[in-house]
Amino acid sequence: MHWSDGAPLQGVKILDLCRVVSGPFATMLLGDLGADVLKIEEPNNGDEARTYGPPFVGGESAYFLSVNRNKRSCAVDLKSEGGKELILRLASAGDVVIENFRPGTMERLGLGFETLRKANDRLVYCGISGFGRSGPEANRPGYDLILQGESGVMDITGDADGPPTKVGTSIADLVTGLYAAQAVLAALAQRQRTGKGGRVDVSMLDSMASLLTFNAGMYYTSGKSPKRRGNAHPTISPYETFQASDGWFNLGVANDRFWASFCKVMDRPDLMAEPRYARAADRAALRSELKAVLEPIFRERPRDYWTALFAGASIPCGAIKSVGEVCEAPQLVARGVARSMQHPAAGDLRYLASTVRFDDQPPPDARRPPLLGEHTNEILTEWLSMDDAEIANFADKGAFGKSEASLKEGV
């Protein structure tokens, strides 16, 4: 497989009715794989993420720009009769619809799965929500912070003597988007066999709970909820974060073989000879004691000294880097992940590209994130073969809202 053979999802048409992060992240991932993603936006303000900031660059939200590459924007008023008719026609011509409204919203708009399926029985319909379509909490709204707490992830994150702590990125939104993209790919594969589309239901709660993995396993087997341990591992030591003289690093002495290498490279035969540290289970039980021995030693030298020392001995380790360090990392540049593109408002726009590589080749350069309603005419012509008169007729029906800006090329 090679990108020069054509993108994997080339020819797949996706109608993106999503806002903010979870849905847009899913559709961006599918766009990265070559799908033709049509982002439907409210005509006057667009995706609310366009207003999130600072920072803004050239009037564009960095938040919005980060999850909306490889898409085209079409401004449609979903509450107008003309807008609803237009969505029905676009869904009839498309392969996938993805939305992240609260359950029942699309039905109230007259654009629910059953309605769209009647127009196109090959349609894959993916609904993303906070708690799913079923169950006693189905109608609750879903927000990243809320779901980080509801999923149990915050309860096991943070220092043992500190408060529950959220993950530094929007992990609930992002992992849900990952699952949604995966589910859509599976549904398209199934459609290839059966000829029929179907409904995909992706819940933020389900997605986050799935990340508990061994933490859930510990509860199911012991009946006890795991507790916060800071950055320490529950069954391995030393396997946590340590402070150097100028920063922080992670050390993962994951087994007895690594322990022997660690003691040797640290020139600490006394630690290797200590019978109480002989086995991994023993070291885990004496985690606090062992950490107290190592902490003052690690504070004597810089971060990069320790990471180089342990890397030379093939002991798992790594610096704790700032976002800036990561965005400038030579490794990401070399692999084609850290890139730049030109945007008419934002100018030279740097971004982290798709991580998917085929035959060691990174994906082609991405299409820049769209301006609001920039491709309305273009899409209606391509997807629906509309002429100017038909487009004007939909405008008269209120399909594009009160503003005519969305009908102007390049707006």
Task: State each model region's role.
Residues 44, 131-132, 204-209, 246, ...:
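Glycine-rich beta-alpha junction loops
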Residues 349, 354-388:
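C-terminal active-site "lid" helix and adjoining low-complexity regulatory extension at the edge
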Residues 1-196, 371, 377-411:
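N-terminal helix-loop segment corresponding to the beta1-alpha1 unit
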Residues 133, 161-171, 192-208, 224-234, ...:
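Conserved Rossmann-fold dehydrogenase catalytic segment
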Residues 235-313, 317:
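Aromatic-enriched alpha-helical interface/lid elements that frame and gate functional surfaces
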Residues 55, 229-234, 239-240, 346-349, ...:
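Short Gly/Pro-enriched turn/cap motifs at secondary-structure boundaries
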Residues 312-364:
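A glycine-rich dinucleotide-binding beta-alpha-beta segment and adjacent secondary-structure elements
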Residues 177-197, 210-221, 263-269:
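Oxidoreductase and adenylate-handling cofactor-binding alpha/beta cores
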